[in-house]
């Protein structure tokens, strides 16, 4: 029996990145031998065991043979005669097909070290094309390591295109697509994930609402980058700088979906695109089974981001009504989330990356003023039932009006 550290732990250590999870491959052993040594079996489809002390995963070396469609259609073979090289060959990328023995020596049968040095994401073998989930995984790795200047090898991107055009991605379940997307949204450069999907044709298949934005022009005065798809990826990049939250980043990604519905004869204007995009946000989220709390914010951002841009022109009643509409009284975090997504929208434009966004500050200040109006004082004044709500709203409007007069500049 020989045990090797494999995959991501080896890769990230070589890149000088923090190692989170460690996975091990066991060569020359059997399930019974592992059980006798005190390991606990957890793998249902192939032999994976938990170490009795560390609880890290130890998998018997195995090969995989395509036996059906999609990313689950594989037959596994695990036996003592499966070599380490056999096991590493089934992995997706060469940089993930590295192993380390107990002496610290790196085993590299597929030139993963060279590709690490050259910052290349390259598939190990043609078997890559048998698993459509790998298209998403490579896009996610490209996003994860973009800050290290990694790029996808030409032949790997070509294979990803072939897989997409062959309809392989249609076998992916919504849950797996969302899981990979959610993971990509946590990276430093989530926009790279969607750009890679577009480069291989997968964006049109998995995110048609986003793909439809490319080639749709916006007014050059407000959008020097012109193309709404490019603007969308720029805003996502900016959102990633402003917030680590997946819901903020996803809502920013979806904020302009309504522009894809504008008839070409009305281009480059997109009047009412915010509310129009709400249905597309719901359609995308329902198809991918996106969690409700993420859907809820994306819906609100699509509907209200343009309103926040015009904040100095809003009357106090409209401002308080906005807080009602986003349910800020019960979910105050939404004020900050809307401020961040709206700022990402404005700064996600060519030449505006360092622009100030005072509307975000005014939104936050107005919220502090509105929420500081005490409910207790209204009740103590003798108001009852529905009158309490009405009087509280009236006092909030008055407080915001007073604040706006002093703090918010009047529109030209």
Curated annotation (Swiss-Prot):
Enzyme Commission number: 2.7.7.72, 3.1.3.-, 3.1.4.-
Binding site for Mg(2+): 21, 23
Entry binding sites for ATP: 8, 11, 91, 137, 140
GO process annotations (BP): RNA repair; tRNA 3'-terminal CCA addition
Keywords, in A-Z order: ATP-binding, Hydrolase, Magnesium, Metal-binding, Multifunctional enzyme, Nickel, Nucleotide-binding, Nucleotidyltransferase, RNA repair, RNA-binding, Transferase, tRNA processing
Highest taxon listed in the record's lineage: Bacteria
Domain HD stretches: 228-329
Gene3D superfamilies for the chain: Beta Polymerase, domain 2 (3.30.460.10), cca-adding enzyme, domain 2 (1.10.3090.10)
Residues at which CTP binds: 8, 11, 91, 137, 140
Pfam family, one: PolyA_pol_RNAbd
GO molecular function: ATP binding; CCA tRNA nucleotidyltransferase activity; cyclic-nucleotide phosphodiesterase activity; magnesium ion binding; phosphatase activity; tRNA binding
Transmembrane spans: none
Catalytic activity entry: a tRNA precursor + 2 CTP + ATP = a tRNA with a 3' CCA end + 3 diphosphate; a tRNA with a 3' CCA end + 2 CTP + ATP = a tRNA with a 3' CCACCA end + 3 diphosphate
NCBIfam families: PRK10885.1
Family designation: Belongs to the tRNA nucleotidyltransferase/poly(A) polymerase family. Bacterial CCA-adding enzyme type 1 subfamily.
Domain characteristics, as noted in the entry: Comprises two domains: an N-terminal domain containing the nucleotidyltransferase activity and a C-terminal HD domain associated with both phosphodiesterase and phosphatase activities.
UniProt subunit comment: Monomer. Can also form homodimers and oligomers.
Note: A single active site specifically recognizes both ATP and CTP and is responsible for their addition.
Protein name: Multifunctional CCA protein
The organism of origin for this protein: Escherichia coli O6:H1 (strain CFT073 / ATCC 700928 / UPEC)
Gene: cca
